[in-house]
Amino acid sequence: MSEARLHSPDPRTPRPMAGWAASLRDSGLLALAVPRVFAGMERDWGEIFAGVRHLAEQELELARRLALHHLQIASILLLGSPEQQRRLLPASVERRWLWSEAVDLRRAQPEAQEHWRGGFLVGGRGSDCFAVEDVDRLLISAWHAPSRAHLIAVAETGRAGIDISGLADGSGLFLPAGQRLHYQRLRLHPEDILVPPGLPPPPCGQLREGLTRLAQANLDLGQAARVPGDVAGQGEAPRLLALALRLVELAAESFQAAFARGGALTFRESAAASLLASEAEAVARAGLLACLRRQALEARLLGAAL
């Protein structure tokens, strides 16, 4: 990743997020997680997340976008059929698609109704998303009431039935600020569906959430590295950050091994990798908060001395 060049957009431009997207498309980083058989670069997860971490030291919003993109590529590898992978991944590399997501498996909205020939119609308020107006493809979720389960699907952002409007307040992973999606009779074709509703989740499904937590841990470590060294090197922060760095490295190795297992992956192996990612996220967040508290204390002391 050190060979790539990323240039921050001018914050005075009317659409700075468009500048972020253009920077990523020009960087050569979008194909890192795509296997070589699909014309990608096939880097391991340790290298990918190290790049996200270092990028977060410079431009946190850009790092968030890059992490989200790679998580969607991973989702296609984990959840998609061989035909879906052959259709989506080479096109993503060739056309430099930027991916994001509107997946929320905790809410029973939006709603999906079965449509003809195995498709679905989706309507209602979707998830709050991070800067989706300049991405090319989305992973979305919808609630299917008859099966009392969610589906996960792929859709292009310009598809009829997707309305991107307003600013979301931002909460949870990757949502410092974003857009709110609404769906109006959004048609999903059978080939769009990565996870049909009502089927038991496979072991690889756990890895998706674990990867999200591992990405957040690396973003937190990158943000902590932006705190001046004389501040971050005091108190409990150094111990926490060193432990978090080791945990994210171990978790990345665990996920790499899990991906290599393919269809032979067990629930036990998937759960172990995801648990390690959760521990890394918790320690990284604690280290970041320790840095920020120390920085705030130093600022107050400096202000009192002036």
Language-model-detected regions and their locations in the chain:
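Glycine-rich beta->alpha junctions and the first turn(s) of the following alpha-helix
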Residues: 168-234
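A short core secondary-structure module
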Residues: 128-164
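Glycine-rich, charged/polar anion/phosphate-binding loops
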Residues: 125-126, 165-170
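Glycine-rich flavin
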Residues: 17-130
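Long, charge-rich alpha-helical interaction segments
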Residues: 2, 7-15
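C-terminal hydrophobic structural anchor segments
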Residues: 235-272
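A structural signal for well-ordered alpha-helices, especially hydrophobic packing surfaces
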Residues: 59, 218, 225-228, 244, ...
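Glycine-rich phosphate/cofactor-binding loops in nucleotide/flavin-utilizing enzymes
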Residues: 265-306
